[in-house]
């Protein structure tokens, strides 16, 4: 009895326990290997579900980029062409639109989306910028994300290009037309202001000759000023001739100096005619012949003087004879 128990314990116990830890150690090492790599979660999906991880939806290629517009061909989903080869990335073109697969929007698979909350491209962009992949990743995400918000309905490529190019031109035309309208509105506004100011300056009331004479007489009577004591007279006068009070006031202000200058000029002309050169007008009539000169004519009477030139000789015809009797023709010189 004593000999059998130790033999059983020594032979049986070590043998089953030794392979167990050996089998457990590789199982623990295997999950540690993918975790040691960067982005192990993404790599795990690439290993198992690479063809099912992403689905390529509508085409996002801008066919009007050269024209400065934005036009899509309307392809709703990527369909690999029969000539595409998985080993050759350049051959992955869509059979519907002919564009490369990279132009289509990449959408994560719905089955894997529940287990993986953040999308793989975002995690790759978050972890890799710190190392050496910072420049390449940013360009691809903006084109897929920006058109996602406003993706047009699937329309054929030719109609889409024509319609969007037309709308682009229309938008440009509308923008230019709105600019023209805005500038035209501003010009009209300024022109309207100028016309308002210009209308105040250029608006002139046309008066009849009767109104001008009456206003001139009234202005002379009032003294070319409108005073409070003359308000009743001004009101009655304006009602008589059919002129507004403000118009009469402006007319008096504008013509005050004009008529004063005319009066001053008329007075100067009268002074020159009357007293400037001591020239008195010669009137035909009865003239008393007082000759202090060389020739005297006797036998006075009514003399009719005919003056041939001012200051020259004059011929006198006498009705009654002079010293010699009969008609005497005399010449006098001053």
Swiss-Prot record:
Major localization class: nucleus
Cited NCBIfam families: homeo_ZF_HD, ZF_HD_prot_N
Pfam families cross-referenced by the UniProt entry: ZF-HD_dimer
PANTHER family: ZINC-FINGER HOMEODOMAIN PROTEIN 10, ZINC-FINGER HOMEODOMAIN PROTEIN 2
Subunit structure, as described in the record: Homo- and heterodimer with other ZFHD proteins. Interacts with MIF1, MIF2 and MIF3; these interactions prevent nuclear localization and DNA-binding to inhibit transcription regulation activity. Binds to ZHD1, ZHD2, ZHD4, ZHD5, ZHD6, ZHD7 and ZHD8. Interacts with KIN10 and KIN11.
Induction statement: By gibberellic acid (GA).
Protein name from the UniProt record: Zinc-finger homeodomain protein 10
Domain remark text: The homeodomain differs form the typical one by having namely 4 instead of 3 extra amino acids inserted in the loop between helix 1 and helix 2.
Sample GO molecular function, one term: DNA binding
Domain of life: Eukaryota
Lineage: Eukaryota, Viridiplantae, Streptophyta, Embryophyta, Tracheophyta
DNA-binding residue intervals: 200-263
Keyword Heme (UniProt): no
Gene Ontology BP annotations: DNA-templated transcriptional start site selection; gibberellic acid mediated signaling pathway; positive regulation of DNA-templated transcription; response to blue light; response to gibberellin
Entries under InterPro entries matching the protein: Homeodomain-like_sf, Homeodomain_ZF_HD, ZF_HD_homeobox_Cys/His_dimer
Keywords recorded for this protein, A-Z: DNA-binding, Gibberellin signaling pathway, Homeobox, Metal-binding, Nucleus, Transcription, Transcription regulation, Zinc, Zinc-finger
Disulphide linkage map: none
Zinc fingers typed ZF-HD dimerization-type, residue spans: 56-107
Cellular localization per UniProt: Nucleus
Record's keyword annotation contains Lipid biosynthesis: no
Pro residues bias: start-end ranges: 136-155
Site (Required for DNA-binding): 252
Membrane-spanning intervals of the chain: none
Disordered as annotated region, ranges: 1-33, 103-164, 292-334
Tissues with expression: Mostly expressed in rosettes (e.g. young leaves), flowers (e.g. styles), siliques and inflorescence.
Function: Putative transcription factor. Probably involved in establishing polarity during leaf development through the gibberellic acid (GA) signaling pathway.
Biased composition (Gly residues): 309-328
């Amino acid at each position: 009895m004593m000999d059998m128990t130790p033999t059983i314990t020594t032979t049986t116990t070590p043998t089953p326990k030794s392979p167990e830890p050996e089998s457990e150690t590789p199982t623990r090492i295997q999950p540690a290997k993918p975790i040691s790599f960067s982005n192990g979660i993404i790599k795990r999906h690439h290993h198992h579900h690479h063809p099912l991880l992403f689905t390529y939806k509508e085409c996002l290629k801008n066919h009007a980029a050269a024209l400065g517009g934005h036009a899509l061909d309307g392809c709703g989903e990527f369909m690999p062409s029969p000539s595409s080869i998985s080993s050759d990335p350049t051959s992955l073109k869509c059979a519907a639109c002919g564009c490369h697969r990279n132009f289509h929007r990449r959408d994560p698979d719905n089955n894997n989306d529940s287990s993986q909350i953040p999308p793989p491209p975002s995690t790759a962009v978050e972890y890799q910028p710190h190392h050496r992949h910072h420049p390449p990743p940013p360009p691809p995400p903006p084109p897929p994300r920006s058109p996602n918000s406003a993706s047009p309905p699937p329309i054929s490529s030719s109609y889409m290009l024509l319609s969007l190019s037309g709308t682009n031109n229309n938008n440009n035309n509308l923008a230019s037309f709105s600019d023209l309208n805005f500038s035209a509105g501003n010009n009209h506004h300024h022109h309207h202001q100028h016309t308002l100011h210009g209308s105040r300056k250029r608006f002139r009331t046309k008066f009849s000759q009767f109104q001008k004479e009456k206003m001139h007489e009234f202005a002379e009577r009032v003294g070319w000023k409108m005073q409070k004591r003359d308000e009743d007279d001004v009101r009655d006068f304006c009602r008589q001739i059919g002129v507004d009070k403000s118009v009469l006031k402006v007319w008096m202000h504008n013509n005050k100096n004009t008529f004063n200058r005319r009066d001053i000029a008329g007075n100067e002309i009268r002074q020159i005619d009357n007293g400037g050169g001591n020239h008195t007008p010669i009137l035909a009539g009865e003239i008393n012949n007082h000759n202090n000169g060389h020739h005297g004519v006797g036998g006075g009477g009514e003399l009719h003087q005919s003056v041939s030139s001012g200051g020259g000789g004059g011929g006198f015809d006498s009705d009654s004879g002079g010293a010699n009797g009969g008609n005497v023709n005399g010449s006098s010189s001053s």
